[in-house]
Amino acid sequence: MSRADNSAGLILASSPIFKKVFGKSNVGRAYDLPFDVQTRKFSYYNAKKQGLRTDPEYVRFIEDWAKVTFIVPPRMDKYISVNMEIQGIFQNYGSPNDIYPYSIDEGFIDLSSSLNYFVPEKQLSRKQKLDLISAKIQRDIWRQTGIYSTVGISNANPLLAKLALDNEAKKTPTMRANWSYEDVEQKVWSIPNMTDFWGIGKRMEKRFNTLGIHSIKDLANANPDILKKELGVAGLRLWFHANGIDESNVHKPYKPKSKGLGNSQVLPRDYFRQRDIEIVLREMAEQVAIRLRKIGKKATVVSIHLGYSNHENKRSINTQMKIEPTNNTDLLTNYVLKLFHNKYTSGA
């Protein structure tokens, strides 16, 4: 949580048990919680505002969980440092060309060229060898960083490895899972929620629903021509993915044309107070500044985009300005707020 000392502190990430106990999404505010983050006491004000129970049994339940909840500040510089350590571990098992960092906490490694070197036993299948080498990588990560890692594996392509990671590996005793083409009908098609599928968000799910598609199995068996006509190349690509087909390659990752560096958030509810919106912008500017300093770069252009709720009859805010090269947090924050103040009137 960023700025936990403030009632408007921003929840940037939450554990599954936190979401289940407190009924919250991954992102929110301290005042969205049914307890005070400082005292860990039940907040009757917040509870009533959200229509929650206030009976003694529920109060005890919330306070008991609040006492054992760890609230920690975001440390992007630390995350980047540990990420670099893990990338170094990957290079013990594959060349830099075989490694593709996907995000701050995920990455792909193609073990095709090194698999038989690390696991030379000829009697073992490729699937068994991949599992053994993945276990070695997990152990190395734990010994060097103290982090328990989860591994999605595939004999086929990066897509199935990612789906195995998101939908099975996190639930297995070994924290590993291997999905191949043979698993598509049984595992890929049975993914319970469409939004649990790589590349499908709430908006895309709604568009699929209007076409009568309500599951990954429905998508896999839909007419690809109709999907392309209604949703463009994105619809066709997801149809291929639903059938386990992925032509992406770790050795030739997508290289964006833009050299920009940014941060984005989809807020869990409407924000009406200008002060709350400014807090979000400040925190995002701070994270971008940290990342700029980490890679030794400076910004020369600052831009912001803010979208309104669907029921607000207002155009989104899109604006930018040229600045003197800087990676200073205070300066970048001031530029962001200046752009915001120049365009914002009111709304959520």
Positions of the model-derived regions?
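Short acidic, glycine/serine/threonine-rich loops at helix termini
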Residues: 10-15, 113-115, 160-167, 232, ...
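Catalytic palm subdomain of template-directed nucleic-acid polymerases
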Residues: 108-138, 212
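Residues that scaffold, gate, or flank divalent-cation-dependent active/transport sites
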Residues: 1-104, 108, 113-115, 242, ...
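Short Gly/Ser/Thr- and Asp/Glu-enriched loop/turn motifs at secondary-structure junctions
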Residues: 101-106, 153-157, 297-301, 348
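DNA-contacting surface of Y-family translesion DNA polymerases
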Residues: 19-20, 204-348
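Long, highly charged, low-complexity intrinsically disordered interaction regions
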Residues: 132-195
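Generic non-transmembrane alpha-helical segments
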Residues: 36, 85-94, 136-145, 207, ...
